[in-house]
Design a protein with these regions (language model features):
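Sec/Tat signal peptide C-region and signal peptidase I cleavage site
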Residues: 14-20
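Hydrophobic alpha-helical targeting segments used for export or membrane insertion
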Residues: 8-14
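Extracytosolic ligand-binding ectodomains
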Residues: 2-8, 20-418
């Protein structure tokens, strides 16, 4: 076991030998701890650390200790690629978990993990481009993600928007792969269901002002604004929209499910703010995570986007390392399917169940990891399915008001195609 393991999720660098005499398995984490997606990356990195702590307390894979080597991508694809290359080329890592946002995960995949046949697991990148790369044979079957694709979420958002009275909508979206694809999927469904998009304004991250984008959207006389953004830029855009007299009615993407966004904009302006997120099917893991994460993370709310899914990404990787006969990337990839087997023994988060899992894996038996987000099962492209959470901001808090199942969304998509 002379390999280091990288989890892509950029943050702090913890240099450690690949496998020291004390049997330490170093796992690299590349997540954006700073930049527009810094809130997600900080939550995700802590979640991976928590999963590793639980696995270590259970005995560790092959009796070894998992340690995270975390690097900060600053939410930038080029920096993430540099970090991933260093970890793969200099430390010979077989796995990368990350990034958080699609505009970071995609360049890691196309530049490093795909060509190099290195396992990559993202906890939060939802762009349909990642599925398309798999279909085109560009991932070599090495990519996985613990979040549903925007190909489904865009349809769920369109139906929810119309149900909440958004008949004419303006759109302001981040000008990257995530924003462009989310808008494309939403637009197809929204128009087919009878909605009208009256204005579209892409924006670049970290602009000094978003007044022009807000002004353009308001001039089109919409019922409200569909804001596809990250919390920092999204709050600035929302404030510009409100200050210029735009209707205080918002449709928000999953990443805007953020206490920081609400605090920055002001809860009193968000009484008609609605959103969709990749949902969960609650299990014992969900209860465990929600009860323990805040204390472990130093106060981060367990509902922070990417927190739950990053724990599951870390747990699945750690269990796959334990299940694999060697630390070869292909062996770990194959083991991911064994630890999420529909025929396996159900395993939940935490020390006790992880100890049970390690015993079963040593005996050569499959397990079914039922994670914080629910039972996890990957298809041939590394995608998962799951419900979509429908939420509304009520008294300054994100409140679940409904759910759309994957079957509901697929039925709606089929109807739209016809």
């Amino acid at each position: 076991m002379k390999r280091v393991i990288l989890l892509a999720a950029a943050a702090i660098a913890l240099a450690a030998p690949a496998l020291a005499d004390d049997c330490t398995i170093t796992v690299g984490v590349v997540m954006g701890l700073t930049g527009p997606a810094g809130e997600y990356g900080q939550a995700g990195a802590k979640s991976v650390e928590m999963a590793f702590r639980d696995l270590n307390e259970a005995g560790g894979p092959h009796g070894c200790k998992l340690v995270a080597d975390t690097r900060d991508s600053q939410s930038q694809g080029s920096l993430a690629v540099d970090a991933a290359n260093q970890l793969v080329q200099l430390k010979n890592v077989p796995v990368i978990i990350g990034g958080i946002i699609s505009s970071v995960s995609i360049p890691i995949l196309t530049s490093v993990t795909g060509p190099g046949k290195i396992v990559q697991v993202s906890p939060a990148s939802s762009s349909p481009t990642l599925t398309n790369l798999g279909r085109a044979g560009k991932t070599n079957g090495m990519f996985f993600r613990t979040i549903t694709s925007d190909a489904l979420q865009g349809t769920a958002a369109a139906k929810y928007a119309l149900d909440q009275g958004f008949k004419r909508i303006a759109v302001i979206h981040v000008n990257n792969d995530f924003g462009v694809n989310m808008l494309a999927e939403f637009s197809k469904a929204y128009k087919a269901l009878g909605g009208e998009i009256v204005s579209v304004s892409p924006y670049n991250e970290k602009q000094s002002s978003y007044d022009a984008e807000a002004s353009k959207g308001i001039a089109a006389n919409p019922d409200g604004l569909y804001l596809i953004a990250t919390p920092v830029d999204g709050a600035t855009i929302a404030r510009a929209w409100i200050s210029q007299g735009g209707p205080a009615k918002f449709l928000l993407n999953d990443g805007m499910n953020s206490p920081d966004f609400i605090a920055s904009v002001g809860a009193k302006y968000l009484n008609e703010a609605y959103g969709t997120s990749s949902g969960t099917s609650p299990t014992a893991s969900t209860e465990y995570f929600n009860a323990n994460y805040k204390a472990f993370s130093g106060g981060i709310d367990p509902s922070t986007p990417a927190a739950d899914r990053a724990y599951d990404a870390g747990a699945i990787v750690g269990l796959a390392i334990a299940a694999a006969p060697t630390q070869d990337p292909v062996a770990i990839r194959d083991a991911i399917f064994r630890v999420t087997s529909k025929d396996g023994e159900p395993i939940h988060a935490g020390k006790a169940d992880f100890a049970k899992a390690l015993d079963l894996l040593r005996a050569g038996k499959p397990i079914r990891y039922e994670g914080v987000i629910g039972p996890v099962s990957f298809d041939r492209y590394g995608d998962i399915t799951g419900p979509f959470r429908l939420w509304k901001i009520v008294d300054g808090k994100v409140t679940t008001v409904g759910e759309m199942s994957t079957d509901d969304v697929n039925a709606l998509k089929a109807k739209i195609v016809k």
